[in-house]
From Swiss-Prot:
Domain of life the protein comes from: Eukaryota
Name of the protein in its database record: Pollen allergen Dac g 2
Coiled-coil region list: none
Disulfide bonds: none
Primary location class: secreted
Record lineage: Eukaryota, Viridiplantae, Streptophyta, Embryophyta, Tracheophyta
Keywords associated with the record: Allergen, Secreted
The keyword Iron is assigned to this record: no
């Protein structure tokens, strides 16, 4: 089974919020990255 990559992009009027969630089943680890 390959890892699952979930990417959500949301744009606001005042600022842009980008949320990237990467889930690795191999290492059973969850990484959350927030960029603004």
């Amino acid at each position: 089974e390959a890892p699952v990559t979930f990417t959500v992009e949301k744009g606001s009027d005042e600022k842009n919020l980008a949320l990237s969630i990467k889930y690795n089943k191999e290492g059973d680890s969850m990484a959350e990255v927030e960029l603004k």
